[in-house]
Amino acid sequence: MEAPGPAQAAAAESNSREVTEDAADWAPALCPSPEARSPEAPAYRLQDCDALVTMGTGTFGRVHLVKEKTAKHFFALKVMSIPDVIRRKQEQHVHNEKSVLKEVSHPFLIRLFWTWHEERFLYMLMEYVPGGELFSYLRNRGHFSSTTGLFYSAEIICAIEYLHSKEIVYRDLKPENILLDRDGHIKLTDFGFAKKLVDRTWTLCGTPEYLAPEVIQSKGHGRAVDWWALGILIFEMLSGFPPFFDDNPFGIYQKILAGKLYFPRHLDFHVKTGRMM
Protein backbone atom coordinates (compact mmCIF):
# COMPACT_ATOMS: atom_id res chain seq x y z
CA MET A 1 0.00 0.00 0.00
CA GLU A 2 1.39 3.39 -0.92
CA ALA A 3 1.68 5.90 1.89
CA PRO A 4 0.12 9.30 1.24
CA GLY A 5 2.15 12.47 1.16
CA PRO A 6 1.58 15.30 3.64
CA ALA A 7 -0.98 17.03 1.40
CA GLN A 8 -3.29 14.01 1.27
CA ALA A 9 -2.77 13.30 4.94
CA ALA A 10 -3.58 16.88 5.88
CA ALA A 11 -7.10 16.50 4.50
CA ALA A 12 -7.66 13.49 6.72
CA GLU A 13 -6.25 15.37 9.68
CA SER A 14 -8.64 18.31 9.25
CA ASN A 15 -11.61 15.91 9.32
CA SER A 16 -10.55 14.07 12.47
CA ARG A 17 -12.32 14.56 15.81
CA GLU A 18 -9.29 15.96 17.57
CA VAL A 19 -5.65 16.64 16.78
CA THR A 20 -3.35 15.96 19.71
CA GLU A 21 0.27 14.96 19.99
CA ASP A 22 -0.69 11.29 19.99
CA ALA A 23 -4.08 9.83 19.10
CA ALA A 24 -5.06 6.77 21.10
CA ASP A 25 -7.90 4.84 19.56
CA TRP A 26 -6.30 2.53 17.01
CA ALA A 27 -3.82 0.36 18.89
CA PRO A 28 -3.38 0.32 22.67
CA ALA A 29 0.16 -1.01 22.27
CA LEU A 30 1.20 2.16 20.43
CA CYS A 31 -0.65 4.88 22.33
CA PRO A 32 -1.54 5.60 25.95
CA SER A 33 -5.18 5.72 26.96
CA PRO A 34 -6.94 9.09 26.64
CA GLU A 35 -7.33 9.19 30.42
CA ALA A 36 -3.55 9.02 30.87
CA ARG A 37 -2.93 12.50 29.46
CA SER A 38 -4.60 15.86 29.03
CA PRO A 39 -5.34 17.17 25.52
CA GLU A 40 -2.87 19.71 24.21
CA ALA A 41 -2.39 21.54 20.94
CA PRO A 42 0.06 19.96 18.49
CA ALA A 43 3.39 21.64 17.85
CA TYR A 44 3.17 20.79 14.14
CA ARG A 45 0.45 20.03 11.61
CA LEU A 46 0.73 18.03 8.40
CA GLN A 47 -0.79 20.80 6.30
CA ASP A 48 1.99 23.14 7.43
CA CYS A 49 4.59 21.09 5.53
CA ASP A 50 5.35 20.61 1.85
CA ALA A 51 6.59 17.21 0.67
CA LEU A 52 9.74 17.51 -1.43
CA VAL A 53 10.97 13.98 -2.11
CA THR A 54 10.69 10.41 -0.83
CA MET A 55 14.01 9.60 0.84
CA GLY A 56 13.38 5.94 1.58
CA THR A 57 10.88 3.10 1.66
CA GLY A 58 10.47 0.22 4.10
CA THR A 59 8.30 -2.82 4.67
CA PHE A 60 5.41 -0.80 6.04
CA GLY A 61 6.12 2.85 5.30
CA ARG A 62 8.05 5.66 3.68
CA VAL A 63 10.21 8.56 4.78
CA HIS A 64 9.60 11.90 3.07
CA LEU A 65 11.75 15.01 3.12
CA VAL A 66 9.37 17.85 4.01
CA LYS A 67 9.78 21.59 4.49
CA GLU A 68 7.81 23.71 6.90
CA LYS A 69 6.03 26.38 4.86
CA THR A 70 6.58 29.36 7.15
CA ALA A 71 9.87 28.75 8.97
CA LYS A 72 11.43 26.86 6.02
CA HIS A 73 12.78 24.17 8.32
CA PHE A 74 13.43 20.71 6.88
CA PHE A 75 12.21 17.52 8.54
CA ALA A 76 12.03 13.80 7.83
CA LEU A 77 8.40 12.62 7.92
CA LYS A 78 8.05 8.90 8.58
CA VAL A 79 4.68 7.60 7.33
CA MET A 80 3.67 4.08 8.36
CA SER A 81 0.69 2.04 7.22
CA ILE A 82 -1.17 0.96 10.35
CA PRO A 83 -2.66 -2.20 8.75
CA ASP A 84 0.81 -3.24 7.57
CA VAL A 85 2.33 -2.57 11.00
CA ILE A 86 -0.32 -4.76 12.62
CA ARG A 87 -0.14 -7.47 9.95
CA ARG A 88 3.64 -7.74 10.39
CA LYS A 89 3.29 -7.68 14.19
CA GLN A 90 5.46 -4.58 14.49
CA GLU A 91 3.30 -2.69 16.99
CA GLN A 92 5.81 -3.16 19.79
CA HIS A 93 8.70 -1.94 17.64
CA VAL A 94 6.82 1.22 16.68
CA HIS A 95 5.87 1.78 20.31
CA ASN A 96 9.49 1.26 21.40
CA GLU A 97 10.82 3.79 18.92
CA LYS A 98 8.27 6.43 19.82
CA SER A 99 8.57 6.04 23.59
CA VAL A 100 12.38 5.99 23.58
CA LEU A 101 12.75 8.99 21.28
CA LYS A 102 10.30 11.01 23.36
CA GLU A 103 12.44 10.36 26.44
CA VAL A 104 15.94 11.04 25.11
CA SER A 105 17.79 14.19 24.11
CA HIS A 106 21.38 13.93 22.94
CA PRO A 107 23.38 15.49 20.07
CA PHE A 108 24.25 12.05 18.68
CA LEU A 109 20.67 10.71 18.68
CA ILE A 110 17.96 11.46 16.11
CA ARG A 111 15.24 13.81 17.40
CA LEU A 112 11.51 13.14 17.32
CA PHE A 113 9.42 16.33 17.19
CA TRP A 114 5.84 15.14 16.81
CA THR A 115 3.62 12.12 16.17
CA TRP A 116 0.06 11.84 14.92
CA HIS A 117 -2.22 9.31 13.25
CA GLU A 118 -5.40 9.07 11.25
CA GLU A 119 -7.38 5.96 10.37
CA ARG A 120 -4.80 4.17 8.24
CA PHE A 121 -1.48 5.93 8.75
CA LEU A 122 0.85 6.83 11.60
CA TYR A 123 3.17 9.83 11.25
CA MET A 124 6.45 10.65 12.98
CA LEU A 125 8.06 14.03 12.29
CA MET A 126 11.77 13.65 12.88
CA GLU A 127 15.02 15.52 12.51
CA TYR A 128 16.35 15.66 8.95
CA VAL A 129 19.97 14.52 8.80
CA PRO A 130 21.38 15.52 5.38
CA GLY A 131 24.58 13.46 5.32
CA GLY A 132 22.97 10.07 4.74
CA GLU A 133 23.98 6.69 6.15
CA LEU A 134 27.44 5.78 7.38
CA PHE A 135 26.85 2.53 5.49
CA SER A 136 26.99 4.35 2.13
CA TYR A 137 30.30 6.04 2.93
CA LEU A 138 31.79 2.79 4.17
CA ARG A 139 30.80 0.92 1.01
CA ASN A 140 32.15 3.70 -1.22
CA ARG A 141 35.45 3.90 0.64
CA GLY A 142 35.87 0.17 1.22
CA HIS A 143 37.10 0.81 4.77
CA PHE A 144 38.00 3.75 6.98
CA SER A 145 41.37 4.80 8.34
CA SER A 146 42.09 4.22 12.02
CA THR A 147 41.68 7.96 12.66
CA THR A 148 38.26 8.08 11.01
CA GLY A 149 37.16 4.89 12.75
CA LEU A 150 38.29 6.29 16.10
CA PHE A 151 36.32 9.51 15.51
CA TYR A 152 33.07 7.71 14.76
CA SER A 153 33.62 5.16 17.53
CA ALA A 154 34.10 7.88 20.15
CA GLU A 155 30.82 9.55 19.21
CA ILE A 156 28.97 6.22 19.19
CA ILE A 157 30.34 5.48 22.66
CA CYS A 158 28.97 8.81 23.90
CA ALA A 159 25.54 7.96 22.46
CA ILE A 160 25.48 4.44 23.92
CA GLU A 161 26.66 5.60 27.34
CA TYR A 162 23.87 8.17 27.37
CA LEU A 163 21.25 5.56 26.47
CA HIS A 164 22.55 3.21 29.14
CA SER A 165 22.37 6.02 31.71
CA LYS A 166 18.65 6.10 30.89
CA GLU A 167 18.48 2.28 31.28
CA ILE A 168 17.87 1.95 27.53
CA VAL A 169 19.55 -0.79 25.49
CA TYR A 170 19.83 0.11 21.79
CA ARG A 171 20.23 -3.44 20.36
CA ASP A 172 20.54 -2.53 16.68
CA LEU A 173 23.90 -0.88 16.15
CA LYS A 174 25.07 -1.20 12.52
CA PRO A 175 26.28 1.16 9.75
CA GLU A 176 22.78 1.44 8.24
CA ASN A 177 21.45 2.92 11.50
CA ILE A 178 24.07 5.65 11.79
CA LEU A 179 23.41 8.91 9.96
CA LEU A 180 25.87 11.76 9.42
CA ASP A 181 24.87 15.39 9.83
CA ARG A 182 26.11 18.32 7.75
CA ASP A 183 29.26 18.59 9.90
CA GLY A 184 30.06 14.88 9.77
CA HIS A 185 28.89 14.00 13.27
CA ILE A 186 26.85 10.86 13.88
CA LYS A 187 23.15 10.45 14.68
CA LEU A 188 21.84 7.06 15.81
CA THR A 189 18.46 6.30 14.25
CA ASP A 190 15.92 3.45 14.08
CA PHE A 191 15.02 2.70 17.70
CA GLY A 192 12.55 -0.11 16.99
CA PHE A 193 14.64 -2.64 18.93
CA ALA A 194 15.57 -0.24 21.74
CA LYS A 195 14.21 -1.24 25.11
CA LYS A 196 14.01 0.12 28.62
CA LEU A 197 15.87 -2.51 30.58
CA VAL A 198 16.87 -2.72 34.23
CA ASP A 199 18.17 -6.30 34.26
CA ARG A 200 17.98 -8.70 31.29
CA THR A 201 15.74 -9.64 28.39
CA TRP A 202 15.49 -12.81 26.29
CA THR A 203 14.16 -11.37 23.03
CA LEU A 204 16.06 -12.44 19.91
CA CYS A 205 16.43 -9.30 17.81
CA GLY A 206 19.01 -7.44 15.79
CA THR A 207 21.16 -8.03 12.72
CA PRO A 208 22.76 -11.52 12.56
CA GLU A 209 26.35 -10.29 12.05
CA TYR A 210 26.04 -8.04 15.10
CA LEU A 211 24.39 -10.40 17.60
CA ALA A 212 26.23 -11.15 20.82
CA PRO A 213 26.73 -14.81 21.83
CA GLU A 214 24.33 -14.52 24.78
CA VAL A 215 21.57 -13.36 22.41
CA ILE A 216 22.11 -16.32 20.09
CA GLN A 217 22.16 -18.76 23.00
CA SER A 218 19.02 -17.23 24.60
CA LYS A 219 20.83 -16.84 27.91
CA GLY A 220 19.35 -13.43 28.56
CA HIS A 221 21.14 -10.23 27.66
CA GLY A 222 21.60 -6.68 28.88
CA ARG A 223 23.63 -3.59 28.08
CA ALA A 224 26.72 -5.58 27.13
CA VAL A 225 25.17 -6.46 23.76
CA ASP A 226 25.61 -2.84 22.65
CA TRP A 227 29.33 -2.96 23.44
CA TRP A 228 29.68 -6.25 21.58
CA ALA A 229 27.97 -4.67 18.57
CA LEU A 230 30.33 -1.69 18.80
CA GLY A 231 33.29 -4.06 18.54
CA ILE A 232 31.76 -5.64 15.44
CA LEU A 233 31.15 -2.18 13.97
CA ILE A 234 34.72 -1.05 14.62
CA PHE A 235 36.02 -4.17 12.90
CA GLU A 236 33.74 -3.56 9.90
CA MET A 237 34.65 0.13 9.65
CA LEU A 238 38.37 -0.62 9.60
CA SER A 239 38.36 -3.80 7.50
CA GLY A 240 35.36 -3.24 5.21
CA PHE A 241 33.49 -6.36 6.30
CA PRO A 242 32.14 -7.81 9.58
CA PRO A 243 34.32 -10.31 11.47
CA PHE A 244 31.70 -13.06 11.27
CA PHE A 245 29.82 -13.57 8.01
CA ASP A 246 28.30 -16.43 6.05
CA ASP A 247 25.68 -17.09 3.37
CA ASN A 248 22.99 -17.82 5.97
CA PRO A 249 22.26 -16.66 9.52
CA PHE A 250 22.91 -20.06 11.10
CA GLY A 251 26.40 -20.10 9.64
CA ILE A 252 26.97 -16.62 11.07
CA TYR A 253 25.76 -17.74 14.50
CA GLN A 254 28.14 -20.71 14.49
CA LYS A 255 31.10 -18.46 13.68
CA ILE A 256 30.14 -15.96 16.37
CA LEU A 257 29.98 -18.73 18.98
CA ALA A 258 33.32 -20.12 17.79
CA GLY A 259 34.82 -16.65 18.24
CA LYS A 260 37.70 -16.97 15.78
CA LEU A 261 38.91 -13.67 14.30
CA TYR A 262 40.98 -13.17 11.18
CA PHE A 263 42.42 -9.67 10.79
CA PRO A 264 43.17 -8.21 7.35
CA ARG A 265 46.83 -7.39 6.81
CA HIS A 266 46.22 -3.66 6.44
CA LEU A 267 44.98 -3.29 10.03
CA ASP A 268 47.64 -1.69 12.23
CA PHE A 269 49.05 -3.11 15.44
CA HIS A 270 46.95 -0.98 17.80
CA VAL A 271 43.73 -2.19 16.22
CA LYS A 272 44.69 -5.85 16.38
CA THR A 273 45.75 -5.62 20.03
CA GLY A 274 42.68 -3.67 21.14
CA ARG A 275 44.66 -0.51 21.94
CA MET A 276 42.92 1.67 19.37
CA MET A 277 40.83 3.52 21.99
Swiss-Prot record:
Regarding tissue, the record states: Ubiquitous.
Entry's Gene Ontology molecular function annotations = ATP binding; cAMP-dependent protein kinase activity; protein serine kinase activity; protein serine/threonine kinase activity
Which residues does the entry assign to the active site, renumbered to this chain? 172 (proton acceptor)
Q: Provide the residue span(s) of the region labelled Disordered.
A: 1-40
Any Pfam family the entry gives: Pkinase
User: Which Gene3D superfamilies does this chain map to?
Assistant: Phosphorylase Kinase, domain 1 (3.30.200.20), Transferase(Phosphotransferase) domain 1 (1.10.510.10)
Task: Outline the extent of the Protein kinase domain.
Answer: 49-277
Give, as one word, the top-level EC class: transferase
Provide the residue positions that the database annotates as binding ATP.
Answer: 55-63, 78
Locate the Phosphothreonine modifications and list their residues.
Answer: 203
Tell me what reaction this enzyme catalyses. L-seryl-[protein] + ATP = O-phospho-L-seryl-[protein] + ADP + H(+); L-threonyl-[protein] + ATP = O-phospho-L-threonyl-[protein] + ADP + H(+)
To which protein family does this belong? Belongs to the protein kinase superfamily. AGC Ser/Thr protein kinase family. cAMP subfamily.
Protein name as annotated:
Putative serine/threonine-protein kinase PRKY
**Species the sequence originates in:** Homo sapiens (Human)
